[in-house]
Amino acid sequence: MISSVCVSSYRGRKSGNKPPSKTCLKEEMAKGEASEKIIINVGGTRHETYRSTLRTLPGTRLAWLADPDGGGRPETDGGGVGSSGSSGGGGCEFFFDRHPGVFAYVLNYYRTGKLHCPADVCGPLFEEELTFWGIDETDVEPCCWMTYRQHRDAEEALDIFESPDGGGSGAGPSDEAGDDERELALQRLGPHEGGAGHGAGSGGCRGWQPRMWALFEDPYSSRAARVVAFASLFFILVSITTFCLETHEAFNIDRNVTEILRVGNITSVHFRREVETEPILTYIEGVCVLWFTLEFLVRIVCCPDTLDFVKNLLNIIDFVAILPFYLEVGLSGLSSKAARDVLGFLRVVRFVRILRIFKLTRHFVGLRVLGHTLRASTNEFLLLIIFLALGVLIFATMIYYAERIGARPSDPRGNDHTDFKNIPIGFWWAVVTMTTLGYGDMYPKTWSGMLVGALCALAGVLTIAMPVPVIVNNFGMYYSLAMAKQKLPKKRKKHVPRPAQLESPMYCKSEETSPRDSTCSDTSPPAREEGMIERKRADSKQNGDANAVLSDEEGAGLTQPLASSPTPEERRALRRSTTRDRNKKAAACFLLSTGDYACADGSVRKGTFVLRDLPLQHSPEAACPPTAGTLFLPH
């Protein structure tokens, strides 16, 4: 092994590969004796490597451990701390309560210089581990970058769907999940003074608004909301059915209308025919419009954000579909020509009622998935349109000139024997042919035109078939994510212990009351001046936020009471946070965990493993005396 290392140092020189000399062997043996091995225990798995290997990536957490001059090696009474059972000056062992499988890839990155992403580890977990070890996510190899990015795409897709967390019973929002949403709605609707004494105040008056909003907006919030949703669905179907039946001859009545017009002393009689709809359909449509009007008014009065409500496309469709009915009722008694023109225009606008079918997206997940798929596949649709436009332009021009080849000499324009009189008409034929519809209204009649038609059909099949699989894959991905989120069980609130406050008597102390086991005395002023922050990793599996770091700037806010549970918006924002944002905070933070640590005398004590961010001008000994289980890292 030593000779191979020595030989590798000679490779690449002009003189070629030389055999190692005795001097080289002695130097390499001296280096091997001088280099110290380091043992890193991660989650119970011991990894052994050289300090020189860890120094390949300076500025990372493992590089700090390998630096003996920067306080990376814990010391007790000036001696090195080895693992229990090893000599005091031998290999030094450090313990980290992290994922051992991911650390193997991290350590291999130090050895080979290539960072690969494990396929059996969830993306957010690998992202958190990279943040903890101080490795930038951009160092991931290109072959693993797609695997690494999949979790972010999945998280963004999950955030798009606002599917409820309700169970199959159909009951209202229960326990903490419903309370969080109601509290969030109250906060959006205005200042809520939740007290018994304020029941008649503004808080009491606004307390019904989120309930009414959930009743008409969220079909899964309660049983009453489901009843309202089914009623709305019933009226939508009835309105669309009525709209379609109005065009059938069986429900149309022809009337002869006589008009007497007087212009000065001249009186004229005009007869005209009008088509009226059966009164029963008009009454049914009136009942449906009354329901939609009530629903629209309740939702706009109780909405948390009026601006967002007005900008919603479905709400605009509701308003445009309701307005023509009232205008028709108001103008029906007028017989002037202007009133008849307005009524004719309103009858044309009534087709907007058919767009109410899109309100079914609140009740059917598949329709929501289709809408999100269309929005997510915008680039593919643009690519499809560009391909189709290029093909239409090319083949319409080719078919026009190909049909001119068989023209007779007596026909200078060449239009007598073909339907392709000009290139714009060829656009229609090219679109129909490329989309494989083939209506048969236009077709080539010459052998050259038939050849162009065959090429156009083949090009259409190949062109349209390319973007379609991408759109289908997007639909499958969104649908599977939506189904998974619907079946996701409710998350109960978990108790998260608050971090130790700066003025707490237990701050910066170990679990035992012995002075020699404490990592720092509570009377050490330099530590407080530097704003050292501690954080217990009490629940490392709660929503993936247990490893969120706290910066020194947030140290002043630790003395204030913390919320017991983040709001749904805060949880969504934390889940969407990127690694780079967290790396900025992690650069000025440290991790605190408790465990057993081996001392120089061979005994095992309870201690605290602390990583602190200290400036270079202050030595670690000035901030806190080195004790067993304490590790100081330079800035």
Swiss-Prot record:
Record-stated family: Belongs to the potassium channel family. C (Shaw) (TC 1.A.1.2) subfamily. Kv3.4/KCNC4 sub-subfamily.
UniProt free text on domains: The cytoplasmic N-terminus mediates N-type inactivation.
InterPro entries for the chain: BTB/POZ_dom, Ion_trans_dom, K_chnl_volt-dep_Kv, K_chnl_volt-dep_Kv3, K_chnl_volt-dep_Kv3.4, Shal-type_N, SKP1/BTB/POZ_sf, T1-type_BTB
Job description of the protein: Voltage-gated potassium channel that opens in response to the voltage difference across the membrane, forming a potassium-selective channel through which potassium ions pass in accordance with their electrochemical gradient. The channel displays rapid activation and inactivation kinetics.
Glycosylation sites: N256, N265
Organism per entry: Homo sapiens (Human)
Protein name per its UniProtKB record: Voltage-gated potassium channel KCNC4
Complexes and interactors: Homotetramer. Heterotetramer of potassium channel proteins.
Residue positions, PTM Phosphoserine: S8, S9, S15, S21
Gene Ontology MF terms in the entry: delayed rectifier potassium channel activity; metal ion binding; potassium channel activity; voltage-gated potassium channel activity
Gene: KCNC4
Chain residues that bind Zn(2+): H116, C122, C143, C144
Transmembrane region(s): 227-247, 278-298, 313-333, 345-364, 381-401, 452-472
